[in-house]
A protein has these predicted regions:
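Polar/charged, compositionally biased leader and regulatory segments
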Residues: 1-99
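Short, glycine/small-residue-enriched coil/turn segments at secondary-structure junctions
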Residues: 60-61, 91-125
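Envelope-exposed proteins and targeting segments
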Residues: 66, 97-99, 108, 116, ...
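Residue-level recognition of beta-strand microenvironments
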Residues: 73, 123-124, 151, 168-171
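Short, acidic/hydrophobic/Gly-rich beta-strand patch recurrent on exposed beta strands
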Residues: 101-104, 132-137, 184
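Short, well-structured beta-strand-loop connectors
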Residues: 112-121, 153-168
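Zn2+-dependent peptidoglycan hydrolase active-site motif and core
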Residues: 114-149
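Conserved, short, structured surface segments that act as functional micro-motifs
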Residues: 157-209
């Protein structure tokens, strides 16, 4: 009798295990049947914050406060003869067209600001032009700041519009201006008159240049 019960118990356990195995196999088969091939699974893209995303809508601002004055303008051939003469730079016996705008404040130092957001691609001390910082913006536009002092940025830094990048300093090339900022706007490696592009968006500057 005990042997019969033992055999029945083993049979019960075996049958139960077999039943559970078959049920599990059926569930797995159903899951596998409903699986989609890898290439059929839609890819969900996650947008990341891009600091340069809105640069195109920024307007180009002057790199100085309103109390800082223009001491020498850009040599623009559309100007009259008097202004063209004023936009010449005399150095070592030669007159050269001014490729930017020079700002002064009665020989006082003043803060210099990033005209638009971008990346610092150059920080260099030039023997004639003094300390130079170049910021690259979108659309092939660069702003260049020469004759700087007390520079606050390094090459590779991401700067936002209005960040202080340094102070006005001195250089050899325009030593008669004493403390000043020489500011250049370059589009596709060509210098342009900054006055024509202030208060325009970066996007518009590129399309109209």
């Amino acid at each position: 009798m005990k042997g019969l019960l033992k055999r029945n118990k083993k049979t019960f356990i075996f049958m139960t295990s077999l039943l559970l195995f078959l049920i599990g196999a059926g569930v797995i088969q159903e899951i596998v049947k409903n699986l989609k091939p890898f290439e059929d699974v839609p890819v969900v893209s996650v947008e990341t914050k891009d600091e340069n995303k809105n640069q195109g809508s920024e307007i180009l601002k002057k790199p100085v406060n309103d109390d800082v004055k223009v001491s020498k303008g850009f040599y623009d051939t559309s100007l009259d003869d008097k202004k063209l003469e004023e936009a010449l730079v005399y150095f070592e016996g030669v007159y050269r067209p001014n490729d930017g705008i020079d700002y002064t404040k009665d020989n006082e130092s003043f803060d210099v600001y990033a005209s638009a957001s971008g990346t610092v691609i150059r920080k260099e001390n030039d023997s004639l032009l003094g300390w130079i910082v170049t910021i690259e913006h979108q659309k092939g536009i660069q702003t260049i700041y020469q004759s700087l002092d007390d520079i606050k940025v390094e090459k590779g830094d991401q700067v936002k519009q209005g960040d202080v990048i340094g102070k006005a300093g001195n250089n050899v090339y325009q030593s008669t201006l004493k403390k000043h900022l020489h500011f250049i706007v370059s589009i596709d490696d060509k210098t342009v008159n900054p006055d024509k592009y202030f208060n325009q968006t970066i996007e518009k500057i590129k399309t109209t240049s």
